[in-house]
UniProtKB/Swiss-Prot annotation:
This is Small ribosomal subunit protein uS10. InterPro entries: Ribosomal_uS10 (IPR001848), Ribosomal_uS10_CS (IPR018268), Ribosomal_uS10_dom (IPR027486), Ribosomal_uS10_dom_sf (IPR036838). Keywords: Ribonucleoprotein, Ribosomal protein. One of its GO terms (cellular component) is ribosome. Belongs to the universal ribosomal protein uS10 family. Pfam families: Ribosomal_S10. GO terms for biological process: translation. Involved in the binding of tRNA to the ribosomes. It comes from Desulfotalea psychrophila (strain LSv54 / DSM 12343). PROSITE patterns: RIBOSOMAL_S10 (PS00361). One of its GO terms (molecular function) is structural constituent of ribosome. Signal peptide: none annotated. The gene is rpsJ.
């Protein structure tokens, strides 16, 4: 098997997994339309931040409320991208709730 000489690594983060999956599928469709091979999307572990807050402002220490914030993550690799692939990925409009990190090793 040949090792690719060039690849683009894309990491996506979002609080809403539906938005994340939609953005991931848009990126995969764009890359495949231009003829590039795509590895992924690989689901990375979801990080969960939990917060514990007192319900009352003064007394009742035992009465608490818990909140959590889940961050969903995905990883994509685009192998041997063409210039057309890079141009279309730059012009791609993704949802506002998705954080995209692109790495060119």
């Amino acid at each position: 098997m040949m090792i690719p000489t060039e690849k683009i690594r894309i990491r996506l983060k979002a609080y809403d997994h539906k938005l994340l999956d939609q953005s991931t599928s848009e990126i995969v469709e764009t890359a495949r339309r231009t003829g590039s091979a795509v590895v992924g999307p690989i689901p990375l572990p979801t990080s969960i931040n939990k917060f514990c807050v007192l319900r009352s402002p003064h007394v009742n220490k035992k009465s608490r409320e818990q909140f959590e914030m889940r961050t969903h993550r995905r990883l994509l690799d685009i192998l041997e991208p063409t210039q057309q692939t890079i141009d279309l990925l730059m012009k791609l409009e993704l949802s506002a709730g998705v954080d995209v990190e692109i790495k060119l090793p």
